[in-house]
Amino acid sequence: RMMELNKTIYWKPESTGTGRFGKWLENINDWNLSRSRFWGTPLPIWATEDRTELKCIGSIEELISEIEKAVAAGVMKENPYKNFKVGDMSKENYSTDNIDLHRPYVDNIILLSSKGEPMRREPDLIDVWFDSGAMPYAQVHYPFESKEGFDQIYPADFIAEGVDQTRGWFYTLHAIAVMLFDSVAFKNIISNGLVLDKNGNKMSKRLGNAVDPFDVLKKYGADATRWYMISNSQPWDNLKFDVDGVDECRRKFFGTLYNTYSFFALYANIDGFTGAEAEVPVEKRPEIDRWILSELNSLVKDVTASLEDYDPTPAARRIDQFVGENLSNWYVRLNRKRFWGGELTEDKLAAYQTLYTCLETVAMLAAPIAPFITDRIFRDLNATSGRHTEESVHLAEYPKCNEALIDAELEAMMSLAQRASSMVLALRRKVNIKVRQPLQKIIIPVLDKEMAAHIEKVRTLVMNEVNVKDIELITDTTGIITKRIKPNFKTLGPKYGKYMKQIAALVAGYTQEQIAAIEANDETILDIDGEKIVTTAADFEITSEDMPGWLVASEGKLTVALDITITDELRREGIARELVNRIQNIRKESGFEVTDKISVEIEATELTSPAVESFAKYIAQQTLAVDVKAVAAPAGQFVVDSDIDEVPLKIAVTKA
């Protein structure tokens, strides 16, 4: 019966339930319940000297009744528990002054057999694992109390402990529950792995590789520690604990989340946005708002599914990815100008409301893993908006997915923009061309009309993100982009290992058209010695070769080619953007308010003079400057030594 009921328990991982625990149940031996100890729960069994009669006492009431019989028969002088009131469940009644059921006191109790012979308690104790297994009942004094409502706490919805407990707590819980109630003691369970050192060795003070958790908590905080442990590996896997990983979580995830909130709070306070304003309908908001809200609700859906599956690791990773890639690095960065200056227009209000919703929802989603910073963000947001009556994120309802706001096509389109942008930025880094330096063009080969339509919709967005003047879409890459193909041994090997040499030889001779067909089609059938081999694009590694004056990158079905030729005009614009960066830094370091107008003087050099002449208006717009000039000797309120491309220059900034 224990094996049958075990199959109804949801084990994470499943292999522990079917393997380690299941095999243990299949080969189980009788449980030797007694232990020769002093401290613990005494066996409630009394026996005559010849062991012909045994009594197992089931309650204090029964014990006191048996003691009274023994006293009446003269076997005991008096009842040691005479002051105890049966039925009185108060702490005072259960004080050790009234009753103590431990050794040595219980050893002095002598009961009376049915034949009038004295009965003494078996001297052993109960195995402490029986105490642990009885925890569900003992914690509420069942069945002597809490009969009503017991079914609300039993069986437990969820428990977690180390995998070594398959023969300990997991077993005793299960055995007692099956014996007493023909039931399971728990419905869902995670068997935790071990925490090892960063090299995968068991931590030991003797070896000096132990990490003091209190030191980690003090230095990095509980949130970062918890997030690292949950996101780094699934709970049932062994965790190679590296303090540097905790610090990375603190900087990357929590630093990004806090900076995003700080950005929102800064401009919301300037504009007087509270979060209590009438909502701009989602359908009236810009596409970028609808996209992030779609991604947000997909996030809620994914995180909820992971947590309901008792798998918090993918949940943490999805939240991390959303905050870092979608919210901070994409939405906020592409929408900064919507928050700057001007009146609180409907467009700006939509931006505030969208970012507010994202921050609030992320705080609520992440709260079970990072309880402190999420509660701080939730409370700060709610203090001005009053959207929630609950004073803490931990009292609020968990977010629910709004399926109506999920737009899969919009997400796919924006994902394409993100991937293309990421690839172009990686190409820039490859040759040390800063993003502030504009380039002329990127070429993207399109495989079908849908891909072309998606890129057209995000054309301007990608151009702004990677700072290029144009995107050219092509269908024929002949003479422009040369691709190479080879088998992906990780995916093809397990399926067609004995044919790998033939497959490699076959695709090595593929034309550009054949390679393009593999990228475009869902499946490609190869004929190897009469054997039909079904493959997908993922079964091959397809790379692109650089062209003269261009850099090329491929990722899956997406290929981009970047023109890295810098003309004089592009160079001047790049210098202008560098000047904007330097002036913004001076504004910040000099303590200017974000709304302050300024005047700017830039030292005239061969680099700066042409740039200022061509782009003075652009520089002024970006820096809230009323005047921008290139002069021989800059003078003003703040004169700062700076440089561009390691060429020194002075910049003067004065509050206008």
Listing of model-derived features with the role each one plays in the protein:
Residues 153-164:
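A short glycine/serine-rich beta->alpha loop
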Residues 23-130, 134-136, 180-222, 237, ...:
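Feature 926 captures the class I aminoacyl-tRNA synthetase adenylation module centered on the KMSKS loop
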Residues 174-179:
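Substrate-binding cleft of carbohydrate-active enzyme catalytic domains
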